[in-house]
Amino acid sequence: MRVAIIDYGSGNLRSATKAFERAAREAGIDATIDLTDKPDHVASADRIVLPGVGAYADCSAGLNAMPGMHEALIEAVEKKAHPFLGICVGMQLMSSRGLEKTVSTGLGWIEGDVVEMTPSDPTLKIPQIGWNTLEIRHAHPLFDGIKTGADGLHAYFVHSYHLAAKHSTDVIATTNYGGAMTAFVGRDNMAGAQFHPEKSQTLGLALISNFLRWKP
């Protein structure tokens, strides 16, 4: 199995690569982790990971500036239906639009806009930086065997915006930060984490292992 992590100049690329390598090794999964900026590597990969940190508009522009990469994603994810995981802004790019700084077009896989978080508690700081729990809204194979809820494992977040999905069925998990904020989305062979699995220790490694086993 070859897993393509897309290098478009954004994301915790080294830590993401190391986390996927570790998860595969500890789970006994034979996987080559390919950090790549080559569209043909993405189009032919068995699984695709899109990381991302920073502003939506910048990440969208960076991805679109890579000749052939958008077409490669369409080929692998839409046409071949290979498993896809977006991380942080990579997850946000799965949306219809991002409303940070300006209006930017996303991949359109999860209908909805990425909007600024507005916690009901004014003492909560933006961005949300740190550990928080997850509430599962709809069962998903990537959370198999992972304890969630108030007394469950914690995920690591760094974000000021979240995906306001049009369809509640696309929201797999939320996190409470002065209200329910989208933490994980999924539809068909596509999944996305607002948190950073590569920084989320036990929860993150378990989720990555589940992604490597996932057969949507």
Swiss-Prot record:
Pfam family, one: GATase
EC number: 4.3.2.10, 3.5.1.2
Compartments reported by the entry: Cytoplasm
Glutamine amidotransferase type-1 domain residues: 2-216
Molecular-function annotations in GO: glutaminase activity; imidazoleglycerol-phosphate synthase activity; lyase activity
Transmembrane residue ranges: none
Pathway annotation: Amino-acid biosynthesis; L-histidine biosynthesis; L-histidine from 5-phospho-alpha-D-ribose 1-diphosphate: step 5/9
Residues at the catalytic site: C88 (nucleophile), H196, E198
Domain of life: Bacteria
Entry keyword set: Amino-acid biosynthesis, Cytoplasm, Glutamine amidotransferase, Histidine biosynthesis, Hydrolase, Lyase
Catalysis performed (reactions): 5-[(5-phospho-1-deoxy-D-ribulos-1-ylimino)methylamino]-1-(5-phospho-beta-D-ribosyl)imidazole-4-carboxamide + L-glutamine = D-erythro-1-(imidazol-4-yl)glycerol 3-phosphate + 5-amino-1-(5-phospho-beta-D-ribosyl)imidazole-4-carboxamide + L-glutamate + H(+); L-glutamine + H2O = L-glutamate + NH4(+)
GO biological process, one term: L-histidine biosynthetic process
Cellular component terms per the entry's GO annotation: cytoplasm
InterPro entries: Class_I_gatase-like, GATASE, Imidazole-glycPsynth_HisH
Biological function: IGPS catalyzes the conversion of PRFAR and glutamine to IGP, AICAR and glutamate. The HisH subunit catalyzes the hydrolysis of glutamine to glutamate and ammonia as part of the synthesis of IGP and AICAR. The resulting ammonia molecule is channeled to the active site of HisF.
Subunit structure: Heterodimer of HisH and HisF.
Protein name: Imidazole glycerol phosphate synthase subunit HisH
Organism, as annotated: Agrobacterium fabrum (strain C58 / ATCC 33970)
Gene behind this protein: hisH
